């Protein structure tokens, strides 16, 4: 890099100074690191590279002969082309489908998915017309996810925002380490639900298994049916 005098720097624009000094700049990414989001952050927040999509522009994708990686790459390609409503056909229990979507999108999955589906999302609305495996919606930041049937264990692990809804029953450790958002279960939930819960709310219309709310820091759990037992640090209230 050639030497630059102080007077030369003063006469340059900001962009010229950055280039002359060999500096680089890059967009900061990701959410705030606060335990709970600023209530207005979701509406204001967007990723600078997120594609602009048209919800009225709709397409279907048959995933029967595709790997999960290929499906996820194709979703991003379709979004870059402006598609705002995407229907995935024949998912056949594939793992890690629709992860890391950081943009507004209407996504409809016609069938069941495997482990870690729709994790790390920030913005999309997802409907799954089937069942889901373990850890659906893990680390979700915003958006909505609706599962028409049942879900496996660790449903909504570590979510920080958004609405995660399962019309059926879910497995154990629902909402483990959740830091915000809302989890709604139409049926029952298994043991250790709300384990190490920090914030947010969980609404279960049915029964809850053993050790509900074990090691909770904060947050609220509503149970419509019976509770098998409470965990350490859980406090019952009416």
Would you name each region that the model predicts?
Residues 1-238:
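Long, distal/terminal scaffolding or interaction modules
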């Amino acid at each position: 890099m050639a030497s630059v005098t102080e007077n030369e720097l003063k006469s340059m624009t900001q962009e010229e100074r950055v280039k002359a000094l060999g500096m680089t700049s890059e967009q900061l990414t990701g959410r705030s690191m606060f335990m709970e989001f600023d209530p207005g952050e979701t509406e204001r927040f967007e990723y600078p590279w997120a594609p602009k999509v048209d919800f009225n522009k709709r397409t279907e994708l048959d995933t029967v002969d595709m790997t999960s990686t290929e499906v996820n790459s194709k979703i991003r390609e379709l979004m870059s082309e402006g598609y705002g409503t995407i229907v995935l056909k024949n998912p056949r229990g594939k793992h890690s489908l629709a992860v890391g979507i950081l943009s507004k999108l209407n996504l409809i999955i016609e069938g069941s998915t495997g482990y870690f589906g729709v994790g790390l999302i920030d913005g999309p609305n997802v409907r799954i017309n089937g069942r889901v495996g373990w850890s659906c919606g893990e680390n979700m930041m915003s958006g909505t996810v609706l599962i028409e049937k049942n879900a496996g264990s660790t449903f909504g692990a570590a979510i920080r925002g958004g609405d995660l809804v399962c019309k059926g029953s879910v497995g154990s450790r629902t909402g483990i380490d959740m830091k915000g958002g809302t989890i709604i279960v139409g049926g029952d939930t298994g043991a250790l639900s709300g384990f190490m819960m920090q914030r947010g709310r969980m609404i279960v219309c049915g029964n809850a298994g053993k050790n509900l709310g074990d090691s909770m820091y904060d947050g609220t759990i509503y149970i419509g049916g019976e509770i098998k037992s409470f965990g350490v640090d859980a406090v019952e209230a009416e």
